[in-house]
Amino acid sequence: MENLNQETFATPFVFKTDWKNALEDEEFIKVFSSDILENYIINKRWYGGKASTLKYIEVVDHFKITSKKNTYYGVLLEVNFKEAFYQHYFMPLAFMAEEELDTNTIIAPIQLGNQKGYLVDALHQEDFRKLLFDNIVQAKENPELKLIFHKGSKFDDKEYKSSKFMGLEQSNTSIIYNDAFVLKIFRRIYVSTNPDYEISRVLTERMHFKSSHAYTGSI
C-alpha cells in the first residue's frame, strides 16, 4: 500500500494526550495546525489557496462525533495568507492504530501516549461515512455536536448498505450512498448558506420541481 505523506515525516509526532481529548490539548492543536497541516493541505485538490502564500493555519472550531468503533472530529480551519486574507476549510479527522490502517490517505504518523498510529481523513473510513448516513436518517438534533442533521421529505431509505466516492474531489468530496443518494461534503466553507443546498431544497420542498435531483437531507 502506498502511504500518502508517509515519506514526508520520517518519525511520528508524539503527544501525551489520547485521541478522545486531542482537540482539547494545546500542544496537539499547535503541532497539528503548523507542522502537520501546512505540509498536507497545500497538496490537496480542494485547497483553493495555491496561488497565494500561506502564512499560518488556525483551528477555529471543532466537533466530536462517535460511533461504536471510533471517535471522529470535524475541524474548521482558518487558513491565513500573507496577502492579508483568509479562507475557511472543513476537515474530518480520524486516528487509526497501526494494525487497523486500511487507507492510503495518511495525513501524518502520530503517537498518542503509548499508542502509535496515523492521523487520516475520516471520509476515507467507511465507519465514518455510515455514521453520517445514520445520523441523517435519524435526524436528531444534538446541541453538543454543534450540528443539525436534517432528513428531507423525499428521503425514504432507512438502512445503510454501501458508500463510495464519486470521481475526483475538487472543492468538495461527493459520496454515493446505496447507489442512490449523493452527499456533497464541501471542503471550503463560507459564512453564508451554500447556494447548492438552498436551491436544491427550495426546488424539492417548495416548488416540487421534478426535473432536478431531489433534496433528501443535509448536515
Segments and roles (model prediction):
Residues 1, 49-66:
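C-terminal low-complexity, glycine/proline- and small-hydrophobic-enriched intrinsically disordered tails
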Residues 2-19, 100-113:
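Short, compositionally biased low-complexity segments
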Residues 61-219:
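Conserved ATP-binding subdomain of kinase catalytic cores across diverse folds
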Residues 10-54:
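Short Lys/Arg-enriched alpha/beta "domain-start" segment
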Residues 1-10, 60-63, 73:
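Contiguous mid-protein beta-loop-alpha structural module that forms a pocket-lining wall or clamp
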